[in-house]
Amino acid sequence: MEIQKKIAVVDFGGQYAHLIASRIRRLGAYTEILSNEEPLSSYQKYSGIILSGGPESVYEPDSPTITTKLFELGIPVLGICYGHQLIMKLLGGVVERSGTGEYGPASLELHSQNGNSLLKNFVGGEQVWMNHADEVVKLPEGFSRIASSKDCGYAVVENSSKKIFGIQFHAEVSHSEKGSVLLENFIQICGASRTWGIDQFLKEKIKEIQETVKPEQKVFMLVSGGVDSTVSYLLLCKALGAERVLGFLIDTGFMRKGEVLPLQEKLKSQNIHLTVRDESNLFYESLIGKSDPEEKRKIVGNLFLEARDRAVKELDLEHGDWLLGQGTIYPDTIESGGTKHSHTIKTHHNRVEAIQKLIEEGKVIEPIRDLYKDEVRDLGLLLGLEREWVGRHPFPGPGLVVRMLAVEKTSTDEDQKEIDSYLSTQNGLSGRILPVASVGVKGDRRSYANCVVLNDVETDWKTLDRVATHLSNQFSFINRVVLLPFEKEVKNLTFRFTGMHLDKKCSDLLREADSVVESLIFKAGLYNQIWQMPVVLLPIGEKENEKSIVLRPVESQEAMTANFFPMKRELLKEIKTEVLKIPGIRYVFFDLTNKPPGTIEWE
């Protein structure tokens, strides 16, 4: 698609490079992703350039950089997070390690009332989303401060004469209020064309699939039951014809309760035939004694491939030229370290080594790999899926196995004393560090740290949000905070690590809890208000073999950022009461963690 006035996003390896491009496209301007090592002539083709965030520090040796001649082209430039810091450093400013870092929401304070073009229609007090450990402490000559936050002195800066801008927060994520307004303002500054839309993506993607898949080739599509793989399946069928796409669902033993048959019926109503194979015993056997989240994901990914190979042989498909179809979306590739400078947050099951090898050999097709969840849903509607279907909560490809935590992680007495010292100033709140670790993301890097549980003294959600954000920002050994609802005291409770077996017994336990929670959310009419609600099984109890449940309701749009859903306490009490009726469950926790620093899934 050739558009004259388009915007380039230079990828420095952050989780958000492609999300920036996606957001700009949603505003109607076409974007393309470029590396930071392009010749100057490549950048000259664009009407605007955005430098993305990234996991490195600009003052580190060998950190990614870009030619300073870029700033002499007369093209508007916007730096976001790492990109902002890089502009400041290259042009003579100073960047240093931040005292505390900022992860999550912050409030903007404006310092300019001169009608700054980038912050047009901002009034001050807007919430923005931070994710940084470094900060600018001195501006280059010619730049002025436009806005700050409580912990960031230079949240927005500009050189108005050269149209060079820097922002420390992530305007591209849905949790930055007026983030789209800021990006819209930048598009206007650039004078970019406004001709992009999801319908255009569909037309181009169909053409691309037809050109990529040879006439003699067919696609073996792994369908998980989620929205992503279903939309991918429909898109491939539309482009190639249903006779060239074989849908295959592997029952791993870690699917949701009563999911397989309704899924087959739903796809049949869309004229899609789905072959289902029960491989649960193999998955259970292969995961015996496994606990590390990365190892679990890789085992699941490899087992999917082995099951596919057996099916190909048994269905006598070996003699054809087959491609593997996957419902990969962009956050999957980003969290797996899918761009040049990005860090692996967690390896997705469709990014294990064996599948990477197939990708390199050109034997994998992923038709929606450049889209985000909200765009996938829009595409599903365009392809004829019901709104109820595309609005289903996301479910991880590996299934419940990534919601069953098994790694013990002890903390020190000094760590607990630090937590106690802070919470002693928080109006009756107290906390304990739980002996279990979960995956998170801080400053675009993977974190693997402990969780703090807080007592419940009927503190309002806003205050709990503030306290949870401070705990995860201030203490490097913490990346997640949970509440123990309706329990005024946690100091005298026993939180014992009880171990976890990735077997049918434990998966049945989680399946039942998940089903109870989902039914109550539907009953309350909140299913469509909550973007996703993972129910997590923890190896935490008072007695041997007891387990606990974590409720993780979040609000999001694209899965790159999220905040916890402030549930009404009456409903929370009902959910807790019903879940505790399940034999073997000791505690019910409520997750107060935003993303960042915690990923939506615990592993």
Task: List each language-model region with its residue ranges.
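Flexible gly/pro-rich beta->alpha loop and the following alpha-helix that scaffold active-site loops
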Residues: 4-9, 14-80, 84-85, 91, ...
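Structural beta-sheet core signal
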Residues: 9, 51, 79, 166, ...
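Short, basic, low-complexity termini and linkers enriched in Ser/Thr/Gly/Pro
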Residues: 41, 109-117, 269, 425
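Glycine-rich phosphate/diphosphate-binding loops that line cofactor/substrate pockets in enzymes
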Residues: 1-2, 42-45, 209-217
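ATP/NTP-dependent adenylation/nucleotidyl-transfer catalytic domains that generate, transfer
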Residues: 190-603
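Pocket-forming structural segment of enzyme catalytic cores
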Residues: 61-80, 85-177
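Short amphipathic alpha-helix with an adjacent loop that forms part of the alpha/beta core around
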Residues: 37-46, 120, 310-316
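N-terminal segments that mediate ammonia production and transfer
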Residues: 161-195, 578-580
